[in-house]
Amino acid sequence: SVGFKAGVKEYKLTYYTPEYETKDTDILAAFRVTPQPGVPPEEAGAAVAAESSTGTWTTVWTDGLTSLDRYKGRCYHIEPVPGEADQYICYVAYPLDLFEEGSVTNMFTSIVGNVFGFKALRALRLEDLRIPPAYIKTFQGPPHGIQVERDKLNKYGRPLLGCTIKPKLGLSAKNYGRAVYECLRGGLDFTKDDENVNSQPFMRWRDRFLFCAEALYKAQAETGEIKGHYLNATAGTCEEMIKRAVFARELGVPIVMHDYLTGGFTANTSLAHYCRDNGLLLHIHRAMHAVIDRQKNHGIHFRVLAKALRMSGGDHIHSGTVVGKLEGERDITLGFVDLLRDDFIEKDRSRGIYFTQDWVSLPGVIPVASGGIHVWHMPALTEIFGDDSVLQFGGGTLGHPWGNAPGAVANRVALEACVKARNEGRDLAAEGNTIIREASKWSLELAAACEVWKEIKFEFAAVDTLDR
């Protein structure tokens, strides 16, 4: 007779363990589970734990060759989602041994691999992860972090200002460099390659890098401030990406850029290691994130992608604006902004934070607010994001009626006015418009910007909201 009982058995017999006490070394996950009709939540939660760890659809005799108790994921708690008929938050604990050290790629392949196509579930979303210090210690994390970046740039006590060069595609390298120069000369700290500017027929990467470096040095000489342009090193292969980063370093520029979701975590971590070894800051763009994170009942929440980026490595990451043209509810956004910047974050469900997270010694990441923002938003942005942020105005700089440099001047004047008002103890939320109006009296550039954008608002309800 065979030494094991063949056949299909319910997942919950093995993988649903409500009595389990989580360990300090476990990776904990909170999944929003929508089971198919007729599937009980315990079975659905156990199925998630099984399929994302050691389980398969039937009993196999090789299970007897290892200790499932030691290696299996466990669904240890289930709670119904308030206001939703058939959604549950299922908490799963994974033993640390299931994951390769220092590999975000491997962590995601396990936790959000096959399980998302699982038939017993109508939908599945990974809401949050608790990464234990034991695992965090296997990652280098951001190449430099917030304090080192401020020291490199010699800029303190205020948010940094950026601008994405538009039109994003179609400019020649020389005209592109000209726009970079004008913006930096006008008072911005950074300009930025758009995420889809890589190396296209109208502007090859090497030409762009050269003209942007020239613009950078010229603007630095004229303003006496350190300037940066995020040179997008994203490429079709890792080797090509590193080649571009090497060239950027040879030009002596301070910062490069990567599209971390389309480029992939393996490429991103390689680039982050190169950047730390060679003194380059690394700006991260999140192109493709909304494909993954925008639906409320399926996918991965951005706070998880943000945590993953902090582990993989990046000094800046785009994180929504709360006030512009792109998705982002205030409390949720501030929740993952804190996850990016702070060393220790308490569990706080009102901001979507399911677990207390201790980052031990991993440097912080600066959140970048970008997308449909302009001078009238400056008080709100200063109030919401605080000093450790980059505020990025693309159209809000280049769309100025007098041109790029005056657009940059308007933004810098508005920012300095808001920081000054805040430092004097004024309430930016209540007096924001007044502060901007006062400042525009002694800056014609700001007055012109105020006139152009006084009516623009992007008023749509957020799709991804807190559960009430």
Swiss-Prot record:
Its EC number is 4.1.1.39. This is Ribulose bisphosphate carboxylase large chain. RuBisCO catalyzes two reactions: the carboxylation of D-ribulose 1,5-bisphosphate, the primary event in carbon dioxide fixation, as well as the oxidative fragmentation of the pentose substrate in the photorespiration process. Both reactions occur simultaneously and in competition at the same active site. It comes from Tecoma stans. The keyword tRNA processing does not apply. The basic functional RuBisCO is composed of a large chain homodimer in a 'head-to-tail' conformation. In form I RuBisCO this homodimer is arranged in a barrel-like tetramer with the small subunits forming a tetrameric 'cap' on each end of the 'barrel'. Belongs to the RuBisCO large chain family. Type I subfamily. The lineage of its organism: Eukaryota, Viridiplantae, Streptophyta, Embryophyta, Tracheophyta. One of its GO terms (molecular function) is monooxygenase activity. InterPro entries: RuBisCO (IPR033966), RuBisCo_large_chain_AS (IPR020878), RuBisCO_lsu_C (IPR000685), RuBisCO_lsu_C_sf (IPR036376), RuBisCO_lsu_fd_N (IPR017443), RuBisCO_lsu_N_sf (IPR036422), RuBisCO_lsuI (IPR020888). The disulfide bond which can form in the large chain dimeric partners within the hexadecamer appears to be associated with oxidative stress and protein turnover. Pfam families: RuBisCO_large, RuBisCO_large_N. Mg(2+) binds at K192, D194, E195. The record marks K325 as: Transition state stabilizer. Heterohexadecamer of 8 large chains and 8 small chains; disulfide-linked. The disulfide link is formed within the large subunit homodimers.
